[in-house]
Amino acid sequence: MSCPLRPSEAQEGDQLSEECGMLYGEYLMLDKILEAQRLLSEQNNQPVHDEHLFIVTHQAYELWFKQIIYELDSIRNIFSDVLEESQTLEILKRLNRVVLILKVLVDQVMILETMTPLDFMDFRCYLRPASGFQSLQFRLLENKLGVRQENRVKYNQNYSKVFGNDEKALEQIAKSEKEPSLTDLVQRWLERTPGLELEGFNFWGKYQKAVEKLLTEQKELAEKEEAETLKRYKLNDLEKRREVYESIFKVEVHEALMSRGERRFSHKALQGAIMITFYRDEPRFSQPHQILTLLMDIDSLITKWRYNHVLMVQRMIGSSQLGTGGSSGYQYLRSTLSDRYKVFVDLFNLSTFLIPRSYIPPLSTSMRSHLCNWGSANSTNIVSNGNN
């Protein structure tokens, strides 16, 4: 790399030397990276041109996976401690970086699609038994985000078995399963949202009353409908909506949904997410709301990447052939598009529980002051307890 202390007149290419340190290629270890494209098709002295593209694209994926894991680990470390408000901007920056990387990965599939099925068939036989299912980094990425083992689609065997006797890989998998995932840490953070305290602002109690008022008033309007068919439709719709709201108001119903994997966040964390969504315009909830939005973006982009991957696989090998690693190929990949693999599915479903702005419980003077106050002695972070 060029030395920042070198005089400007010494920046010319013919004057580069090692007196100030290593050069560009040495710093990036390009000799190793650029020599890592070994075409198996060359073994028969019949190199397949597109195998080079296949290797480079997947190596690029793995490098980006490494960067995403690096960012996620740093974010999880910040969340592991009491989260200071001054750190939320850093979390936003790193989450946004992950989002932008994932957008690159989604678009990168298009490069592979420049290869035709016949082009792929020319070297596919050399890939067995290697498979994308064996990507250790992608499994670590999933675990660190919060994909649970019980939610994974079965792949003939436990997903970690594909790493065979690779003790280092198995240790990393085991560690990623045991340590708190980003989902776990976000849940703990949401559970400490100021304003949920029963003896304080008691947002949840106020929210339940607001929902009851909304449903009661809408029922009264429905009963005034003269057309019997329309009246019956509106009353039935209101009854269904009441059941939906009761699924979050009744703890036992919420926990039953959690046990079935239909909800992931604890009851208290869900309350915090709803409160942040309602009062996102308040200064101290602005950045937390952006965090929740970026978490959904990450989930969305991973789903889009899976979907693009599914379509590419179907285009290359059809929907009935087995994958090179022995999986059902297209059928297996398509099954990973379900909500089972969405770690922040509860955030997507928050819109189900929204109410019109006019019904949102107004903040008390003390609570509004608390949410507008940055850095008071008793309220230095978003996860501290609000007393009013």
From Swiss-Prot:
Binds 1 heme group per subunit. PANTHER family: TRYPTOPHAN 2,3-DIOXYGENASE. Heme binds at residue 309. GO terms for molecular function: heme binding; metal ion binding; tryptophan 2,3-dioxygenase activity. Its EC number is 1.13.11.11. It comes from Tribolium castaneum. Homotetramer. Dimer of dimers. Pathway: Amino-acid degradation; L-tryptophan degradation via kynurenine pathway; L-kynurenine from L-tryptophan: step 1/2; Pigment biosynthesis; ommochrome biosynthesis. Signal peptide: none annotated. Substrate binds at residues 54-58, 124, 324. This is Tryptophan 2,3-dioxygenase. The keyword Iron applies. It catalyses: L-tryptophan + O2 = N-formyl-L-kynurenine. Keywords: Dioxygenase, Heme, Iron, Metal-binding, Oxidoreductase, Tryptophan catabolism. The lineage of its organism: Eukaryota, Metazoa, Ecdysozoa, Arthropoda, Hexapoda. Belongs to the tryptophan 2,3-dioxygenase family. Its cofactor is heme. One of its GO terms (biological process) is L-tryptophan catabolic process to kynurenine. Heme-dependent dioxygenase that catalyzes the oxidative cleavage of the L-tryptophan (L-Trp) pyrrole ring and converts L-tryptophan to N-formyl-L-kynurenine. Catalyzes the oxidative cleavage of the indole moiety. Required for normal eye pigmentation.
